């Protein structure tokens, strides 16, 4: 029996019901997206349960996954954590989760991975806080025969050092956001950008996708300022306050996540302007709070990035333990929600 140095950090007060399906399926155009059904989400969970059960039966013991989470930077991140923990809790007869909260520090994630290796977990899961600086610890995991799953963010390492990446196409998210912004401001005007954590793949790619699409397709739109808000509401507000002091003719704000957009909304209101009207708001993630803002007329569009990745994480881990091959990129399902869709979609938002 392998020793376990970490306990599963499950919050009993967080009911599993809060993880009912709330993602959306990407449509053929960037302007509409039909919400993914509860049945589809249930099918994903059921498939994961079947796969993990099969792995447990074959090996004669539980599937043990060590997961190093970034921290609690946003509502989206909390929803992802709950998805992982809830799946582990509900399938405790088949899986065991060792969970580490890195508090937004890479050194803490590296320490957690080393501990997972020492404890001999079957699979390591990681949402890397930044892209670089992982080569050595990934090599240590590889030497120990423990595959690594990257969840929702990529790492800048050789592909042979990790098994798969589960997550969204961040560049495409940025492109979709650019198209929505262009529609909202009539394809011309000055806009500002609130970037995510410096060095994080989500921030890098969402900026690349958005900026490249604006430059290529909308020559009359100018990004006049772009600065990191570190994916937090507080920093988003602070940076937006600075933007407003320096620029009086901002027509739109693009935020790499909803939390920064919500901070920007506060700053715009305090400046005596109307967010959603005087300044258009486009962001990424799809958390409940941004739907509330859209329903109130204070935001205009969110590109959803599905955080309910727990079932996919464990299904993929089970396949790896069983020696099965997996895709190098397991894509999650995302979509676009505009303000006119918010009121109808809001009752179904659980994160």
Predicted regions and their residues:
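Hydrophobic alpha-helical
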Residues: 117, 126-143, 210, 229-292
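Bacterial lipoprotein signal-peptidase II cleavage site
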Residues: 5, 18-35, 39-40, 46
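Short beta-strand elements at the ligand-binding edges of bilobed clamshell
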Residues: 99-101, 157-180, 193-197, 226, ...
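Hydrophobic alpha-helical segments within soluble ligand-binding/sensing domains
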Residues: 58-59, 65, 109, 165-191, ...
């Amino acid at each position: 029996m392998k020793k376990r140095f970490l306990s599963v950090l499950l919050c009993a007060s967080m009911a599993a019901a809060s993880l009912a399906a709330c993602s959306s399926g990407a449509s053929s155009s960037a302007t509409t997206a039909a919400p993914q059904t509860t049945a589809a989400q249930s099918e994903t969970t059921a498939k994961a349960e079947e796969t993990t059960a099969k792995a447990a039966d074959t090996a004669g013991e539980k599937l043990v996954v060590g997961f190093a989470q970034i921290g609690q930077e946003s509502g989206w991140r909390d929803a992802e954590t709950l998805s992982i923990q809830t799946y582990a809790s509900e399938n405790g007869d088949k899986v065991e989760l060792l969970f580490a909260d890195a508090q937004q520090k890479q050194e803490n994630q590296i320490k957690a991975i080393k501990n997972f290796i020492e404890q001999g977990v079957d699979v390591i899961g990681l949402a890397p806080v930044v892209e670089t600086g992982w080569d050595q610890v990934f090599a240590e995991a590889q030497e120990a025969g423990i595959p690594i799953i990257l969840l929702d963010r990529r790492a800048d390492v050789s592909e042979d050092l990790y098994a798969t990446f589960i997550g969204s196409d961040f560049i495409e998210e940025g492109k979709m956001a650019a198209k929505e912004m262009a529609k909202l401001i009539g394809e011309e005007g000055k806009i500002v950008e609130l970037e995510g954590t410096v060095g994080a793949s989500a921030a890098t790619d969402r900026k690349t996708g958005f900026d490249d699409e604006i430059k290529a397709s909308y020559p009359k739109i100018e990004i006049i300022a772009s600065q990191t808000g570190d994916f937090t509401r507080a920093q988003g507000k602070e940076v937006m306050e600075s933007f407003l002091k320096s620029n009086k003719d901002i027509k739109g704000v693009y935020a790499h996540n909803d939390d920064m957009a919500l901070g920007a909304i506060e700053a715009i209101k305090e400046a005596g302007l109307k967010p959603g009207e005087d300044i258009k708001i486009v962001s990424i993630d799809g958390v409940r709070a941004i739907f509330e803002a859209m329903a109130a007329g204070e935001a205009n569009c969110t590109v959803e990035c599905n955080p309910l990745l727990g079932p996919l994480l464990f299904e993929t881990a089970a396949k790896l333990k069983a020696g099965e091959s997996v895709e190098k990129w397991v894509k999650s399902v995302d979509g676009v929600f505009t303000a006119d869709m918010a009121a109808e979609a809001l009752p179904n938002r659980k994160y």
